[in-house]
Amino acid sequence: MKTRIALFALIIFSVISCKKHKTVEEKTLTSLEQLTTGNERFLNGRSAHPHQNKKTVLANQDGQKPFAVVITCSDSRVSPEIVFDQGIGDLFVIRNAGNLISDIDMGSIEYAVEHLDTKLIVVLGHTECGAIKAYINDKDGSYKKHFNHIDNIVETISQEKEEIDADKKTPKATNYLGAINANIEHSVKLIQDNPIVKEHQVKIVAMRYDVHTGKVVEL
């Protein structure tokens, strides 16, 4: 009986120690390190699922203080809070097909930077992106395959300078990963040129998520 009690006490102590260690770790890691270490936990099946409880909801009810902005694709396989193992109030997420930057998206970025004082912006593209596949398959450049708003996505990507340059070096039909990276690079450059982002000296990072492995790499 005493052995069982001692074992139970040891388990409780270990859990409390781990929670305390994680709290200290969060405070010492940079914003980018919080994302990369979170992805490592996700990859290794050790997701901590932080800040996902009623206590966190109450702590954020009067405002938010996200440590990073993440611009990513609408693809259901690419959920930033999951792949980076973050929780409520941690990330300011902007999503659309192809992780593009429209005026509205830029306005959202400006809000996070100017009003929430967020100091890290991540553009997170991903493998097997349907928007990039549609662009690659648009061989004749007509864009009008669906005769609806989907065509606008393809046209926007096809006009990106980085995509045009990449296609000149290696035809897009044989350079799928290059097309994904060029699209990410284009969004990064648009953000870098934003006056508010410049003024607040925000760090901007290009990343790519692999839907086959769950791994995020920095470009």
Cite the ranges covered by each PLM segment:
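Short helix-loop-beta junction
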Residues: 85-93
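Conserved functional hotspot residues or short segments at active or partner-binding sites
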Residues: 123
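Portal/gating segments that form or line small-molecule/metal binding sites
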Residues: 81
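Positively charged n-region of N-terminal signal peptides that target proteins for export
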Residues: 1-5
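C-terminal motif of bacterial Sec signal peptides marking the signal peptidase cleavage site
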Residues: 14-17
